[in-house]
Amino acid sequence: EQKPSTLDPLSEPEDTRWLDGKRKRKSSQCLVKSSMSGYIPSYLDKDEQCVVCGDKATGYHYRCITCEGCKGFFRRTIQKNLHPTYSCKYDGCCVIDKITRNQCQLCRFKKCISVGMAMDLVLDDSKRVAKRKLIEENRERRRKEEMIKSLQHRPSPSAEEWELIHVVTEAHRSTNAQGSHWKQKRKFLPEDIGQSPMASMPDGDKVDLEAFSEFTKIITPAITRVVDFAKKLPMFSELPCEDQIILLKGCCMEIMSLRAAVRYDPESETLTLSGEMAVKREQLKNGGLGVVSDAIFDLGKSLSAFNLDDTEVALLQAVLLMSSDRTGLICVDKIEKCQETYLLAFEHYINYRKHNIPHFWPKLLMKVTDLRMIGACHASRFLHMKVECPTELFPPLFLEV
């Protein structure tokens, strides 16, 4: 009886006998190592067989349809130049199938050659590494090309959306103090203001009443401008007065924070409030906002990388305004549809702008979440301030919203 060959790592124990030059199964307990199941290319027919051993084929390998086992055997044989060492005790007359394929390496190799497997397609290690690198480079190139193609084919705003975008942009520009000239017209809050906290807050922070007084002087016109912005939006003016009030109370601090954040100046490390007062982080913090100040400054620093234009800021404000989850709203569905209309026009405008920042649109939408959190934190902070600070310091409109 022939013993298993040590040359082929896939060799199996001998459990067949030779009759008339052909191998036959000796026992029904003979184990068959079939090719591993896995990804099968779409060009193969169902249950297509390996042309060498008849096992289930996995693809087109070295110019033939073969299984993984015969592919690996042929590759190792050529790479390690093993075929000169192969021999057959039965004059090369072995029948090769999935049961006997590991018993005679010479006949298996001859079968590989006879069915058309190409030796010249087997690469050595260095060529295989180079080929794999080339494949990866081509895959990465195709990925970039597809990404560019998808960006080019993303829809820009429709004519109706352009009209809406124009209205929202003009509403923002006409209610945004100092416009694009804010840097030239801003005045820095004196450094000695906001450095000497006097009134204590329950959370341990201090409030500089002089700085707080300065901020309250600009808060009323800032709130008025947010209200005017909302009234210039057609969808907002169509809502019941009760819903308009709820939406304005909910978004007022969020929109004012956004307007301040987009006027962050990294050189002076200041935010410009209401288009006129430039303040540092500690001044805003000691002036009553506490930790909310850090959130607004951090937002300003992150937004500076986005290079938002007036239209994008305006559409962000419209999305914040039309938030259907505000408590007490009557026309929830209508408001939700309004916000969806703004969001779709916003997304199409982002496509039109073609920003270089990867995943610009989802990253920008996350800023809406940040602004909502700032609004919620400010509401909580404001409740404490009403208790700790003299009531006469609060403007009536500020108390109302």
From Swiss-Prot:
Source organism: Cairina moschata
Gene from which this protein is expressed: THRA
Disordered as annotated region, ranges: 1-20
Domain NR LBD: start-end pairs: 160-401
ZnF (NR C4-type) intervals: 50-70, 88-112
Subunit structure: Probably interacts with SFPQ.
Record-linked PANTHER family: NUCLEAR HORMONE RECEPTOR, THYROID HORMONE RECEPTOR ALPHA
Keyword terms, alphabetized: DNA-binding, Metal-binding, Nucleus, Phosphoprotein, Receptor, Transcription, Transcription regulation, Zinc, Zinc-finger
Record's function text: Nuclear hormone receptor that can act as a repressor or activator of transcription. High affinity receptor for thyroid hormones, including triiodothyronine and thyroxine.
UniProt DNA-binding region: 50-124
A single Gene Ontology CC term: RNA polymerase II transcription regulator complex
Protein name per the record: Thyroid hormone receptor alpha
Binding residues annotated for 3,3',5-triiodo-L-thyronine, in chain numbering: 225, 274
GO molecular function terms noted in the UniProt entry: nuclear receptor activity; RNA polymerase II cis-regulatory region sequence-specific DNA binding; thyroid hormone binding; zinc ion binding
Positions of Zn(2+) 1 binding: 50, 53, 67, 70
Domain of life: Eukaryota
Comment block on domains: Composed of three domains: a modulating N-terminal domain, a DNA-binding domain and a C-terminal ligand-binding domain.
UniProt similarity note: Belongs to the nuclear hormone receptor family. NR1 subfamily.
Residue(s) carrying Phosphoserine: 11, 27
GO BP, one annotated term: thyroid hormone receptor signaling pathway
Keyword DNA-binding attributed: yes
Chain residues that bind Zn(2+) 2: 88, 94, 104, 107
Subcellular location: Nucleus
Coiled-coil regions, chain positions: none
Positions of region (Modulating): 1-49
